[in-house]
């Protein structure tokens, strides 16, 4: 039994998954790549005590270098995993990536990292709340499941004049990067879609406060409303507001320019 997700805005019940697996004599495999940072800080239930095998990336919400980890509490399974990975699947070690993972794991144990994850959750909830308000709903735009418990929001465009591709392109024009995403019972083709997936970890990493997240949420809402109305004349002003936010939250605030 496989549990995990890449576009689901709620928590999973790993206890129940394990009960079902035990009942039918199955192994439980959980991929927590998307929400590992939340698990590390206690803001999301951990699958590790319940699953036979857990996998994760070391980037995404863990915010480390690109890579992966495989975990198991079962010694026999762990031995088989080790034998399967090396030498069959893995070659020479990349020491710089290993060092990057070590730094990421140390940071993940810090109070600063937990505060960042808390802002990540706060930001996604602020976004979900804004996108469920009446002016947005009037354009046929809603939020899947009505909210979020995690670091992302899945916008439902099935009843909107906008499709996922159009909405993605509109937001790109105001310098907001999101991705179109299929939603349950999606009537549109998979390369068009009727949804948007919007995540908040990158903004939290850049130091966005709840007030800044509220401004981003407002700009996203106004962009989607304008697109649904065919009123693209407001996009330059919305873009300017985003650029102002980005300038106030630089990627590397402590990085000095060469020559300084």
Curated annotation (Swiss-Prot):
GO cellular component: cytosol
Keyword Cytoplasm: yes
TM helices/strands, residue ranges: none
PTM-bearing positions, type N6-(pyridoxal phosphate)lysine: 60
GO biological process: glycine biosynthetic process from serine; tetrahydrofolate interconversion
A single MF term (Gene Ontology): glycine hydroxymethyltransferase activity
Pfam families associated with the record: SHMT (PF00464)
Keywords: Amino-acid biosynthesis, Cytoplasm, One-carbon metabolism, Pyridoxal phosphate, Transferase
Pathway it works in: One-carbon metabolism; tetrahydrofolate interconversion; Amino-acid biosynthesis; glycine biosynthesis; glycine from L-serine: step 1/1
Site (Plays an important role in substrate specificity): 59
Gene3D superfamilies, per database record: Aspartate Aminotransferase, domain 1, Type I PLP-dependent aspartate aminotransferase-like (Major domain)
Cysteines paired by S-S bonds: none
PROSITE patterns per record: SHMT
Catalytic activity: (6R)-5,10-methylene-5,6,7,8-tetrahydrofolate + glycine + H2O = (6S)-5,6,7,8-tetrahydrofolate + L-serine
Location of this chain's protein in the cell: Cytoplasm
Its EC number(s): 2.1.2.1
Database matches in SUPFAM superfamilies: PLP-dependent transferases (SSF53383)
Cofactors (names): pyridoxal 5'-phosphate
Family affiliation: Belongs to the SHMT family.
Subunit structure: Homodimer.
Known role: Catalyzes the reversible interconversion of serine and glycine with tetrahydrofolate (THF) serving as the one-carbon carrier. This reaction serves as the major source of one-carbon groups required for the biosynthesis of purines, thymidylate, methionine, and other important biomolecules. Also exhibits THF-independent aldolase activity toward beta-hydroxyamino acids, producing glycine and aldehydes, via a retro-aldol mechanism.
Official protein name in the record: Serine hydroxymethyltransferase
Species the sequence originates in: Corynebacterium sp. (strain P-1)
